A protein has these predicted regions:
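A conserved segment at the C-terminal end of the G1
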Residues: 166-176
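Short beta-strands and strand-coil junctions in structured, solvent-facing domains, enriched
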Residues: 12, 83-85, 155
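Canonical P-loop GTPase G-domain recognition
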Residues: 114-162
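Structural detector for short beta-strands of small beta-barrel domains
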Residues: 1-9
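Charged helix-capping and loop-helix junction motifs
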Residues: 90-93
Length: 282
């Protein structure tokens, strides 16, 4: 019997199969091999002494250590233009990690009016990154997110205060209730639980990742310079005609330094100006 892990806690894993959710434990061989099953893993179950056990883990397309999950298809990078203002560097970092791991990043703009959203959109208009503006009053953007979820495993990522919980509640009003019920059963508060939980919705799956604002592939992983131009689609087609990998890494490093040095001077200015100018000069 096969299925995928929806949640793991306290050494137990909950696997969604054609027969429903099965509680199980992994075989000891995984501990010897230093392999830890995570949410999103496709696994094979067998029965030992009347109990289900994880006998095999299918090859992973990708795996992340924070939050612990595997086989992610889409990463929604949630940002707001007000309270807090967006960090272009954080969006660049997260999108680069996602692209390098074969995950499609999608920029989602919340808590913003049309004029402010256009500044953020302009920073990515020459890239291949999809951009979705959310308006809860009209429902704008919610159908676009549902479209991306269909047939895929998705997760939401972003700084505290950008509206991830509000967005999830707008998409899935029952998620908070389901998660609260699980936390109550385990005797834990909603925000002290940091386990990934996968829900099925809109023909796909959504990973609820409480307590995680960032994304980490591996503490030992890095993107080689040969892969930088592919990890930063913001550079557009120009990367193949005017830039090689070294130029990309140097240009981006210079951009980061300028951003850091001018942080104080630009607090009252348009927060997207440096990014737009830097991209135009490449």
């Amino acid at each position: 019997m096969t299925g995928y892990i929806t949640k793991g806690i306290g050494g137990f894993y909950y696997v969604k199969t054609s027969e429903g959710i099965v509680e199980c434990k992994p075989r000891g061989i995984f501990r010897k091999q230093k392999i830890t099953p995570v949410a999103g893993d496709v696994v094979t179950l067998e029965t030992e002494n009347g109990a289900a056990v994880i006998a095999a883990i299918a090859p992973r397309r990708n795996v992340f250590v924070r939050p612990p999950m595997a086989n992610l298809d889409v990463l929604f990078l949630v940002a707001s233009t007000t309270q807090p203002t967006p960090s272009i560097l954080l969006l660049a970092k997260l999108s680069a990690i996602a692209v390098d791991k074969g995950v499609q990043p999608v920029i989602v703009c919340t808590k913003c009016d049309l004029a402010e959203a256009e500044f953020l959109r302009s920073a990515y208009e020459k890239s291949t990154l999809p951009f979705i503006r959310i308006d809860y009053a009209t429902g704008e953007g919610l159908d676009d997110i549902r479209h991306w979820i269909n047939g895929r495993l998705c997760a939401f990522c972003g700084n505290s205060g950008v509206g991830k919980s509000t967005l999830l509640n707008a998409l899935l009003p029952d998620v908070e209730r389901q998660t609260a019920a699980i936390s109550q059963k385990l005797g834990r508060g909603r925000h002290t639980t940091r386990e990934v939980t996968i829900f099925e919705a809109f023909g796909g799956r959504i990973a609820d990742t409480p307590g995680f604002a960032s994304l980490e592939a591996s503490r030992a992983a890095f993107i080689p310079k040969e892969g930088l131009e592919h990890a930063f689609p913001e550079f557009g087609d120009r990367k193949s005609t005017r830039l090689n990998s070294s130029h990309v890494s140097i240009s981006y490093a210079v951009f980061c330094l300028k951003k850091k040095k001018k942080k104080q001077q630009t607090k009252k200015e348009n927060p997207f100006r440096i990014s737009s100018v830097a991209l135009d000069r490449l």
